[in-house]
Regions:
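S-adenosyl-L-methionine
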Residues: 1-89, 105, 113-163
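Residues at the starts of beta-strands that form the adenosine-phosphate
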Residues: 88, 109, 142, 209-210
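Conserved beta-strand/loop positions that form the S-adenosyl-L-methionine
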Residues: 92
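Conserved SAM-binding loop of SAM-dependent methyltransferases across substrates and taxa
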Residues: 96-108
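A short, acidic, amphipathic alpha-helical segment used as a generic capping/interface helix at domain edges
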Residues: 149-153, 191-204
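Mobile active-site "lid"/loop adjacent to the S-adenosyl-L-methionine
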Residues: 168-199
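Conserved Class I SAM-dependent methyltransferase catalytic core
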Residues: 196-242
Length: 243
């Protein structure tokens, strides 16, 4: 892990959780935030602080996207084009889980893979709080986090899956003036190790009905493979592969 990361146990924080994270990732526990990035465990949950910024995962801010008839208009929901019962999806590049949340809101049982331990800790805490929310709890109950390398996880996959979603875009590609607080902090973490081609190959071998890949609008297709169909937005597009 990034050697500039520390753990801080604040007032009301869960000591056992903080100690487990610190031990697992070989980072020190401090009584105050470090000079660079700090994973803070306090009464509010888990947050990432540093460089004058603080970020905590929160699905409550996405309620407006999944209520009042807005969900069917989401590009990702339109891209999956699958209907039925007991549908299963894998978000192989979970990040903070926003896209997985949209799929879960649409009815999918979603498994989220995240290999960065800091991001996984933030996402785990966001899911914990969402499962206590009167509206979010139903959606969050369909989301399961798996911490680990996505390629390895997909190679070990035994159960059939309907959709595998890939978002290999990494925040550092964006100009610093255009990125929000979350990305400013997350881009300071170590980038993911898995190459785009390795992710795509593992997704294909897993045998889903569809693979959905999020791409910058003007970028080339992942690994040069032409999609079955494309959904375009103003800044991004979804390349959709029917298997």
């Amino acid at each position: 892990m990034n050697d500039k990361i520390t753990v801080c146990l604040g007032k009301g924080g869960q000591r056992e959780m903080a100690e487990s994270f610190a031990r697992k990732n070989n980072v020190p526990i401090m009584d105050k935030p470090g000079e660079h990035l700090t994973v803070m465990f306090d009464s509010r949950g888990v947050s990432l602080t540093g460089y004058g910024l603080t970020y905590q995962g929160d699905f409550e801010g996405m309620l407006h996207r999944v209520t009042n008839g807005r969900l069917p208009h989401e590009m990702l929901v339109r891209a999956v084009k699958t209907e039925g019962e007991h549908l299963k999806a894998i978000d192989a590049t979970a990040g903070m889980g926003e896209d997985g949340f949209l799929l879960a809101a649409y009815g999918y049982e979603v498994t989220l893979y995240e290999q960065n331990p800091v991001i996984a800790a933030l996402l785990k805490d966001a899911l914990r709080r969402a499962r206590k929310h009167p509206i979010l709890k139903d959606i969050a109950s369909r989301m399961k986090l798996v911490e680990g390398d996505s390629v390895s996880c997909m190679e070990k996959l035994m159960d059939p899956v309907d959709v595998i979603y890939l978002d290999p875009m990494f925040p550092k590609r964006q100009k610093s003036g255009l990125i929000n607080k979350k990305l400013q902090l997350i881009q300071k973490l170590e980038p993911p190790c898995s190459e785009e081609k390795d992710l795509f190959d593992a997704a294909i071998k897993a045998g889903p009905s569809r693979i959905i890949v999020k791409r910058p609008l003007k970028s080339v297709c992942l690994d040069g493979r032409e999609p079955s169909y494309i959904l375009k937005g103003k800044a991004i597009r979804y390349d959709c592969y029917v298997m």
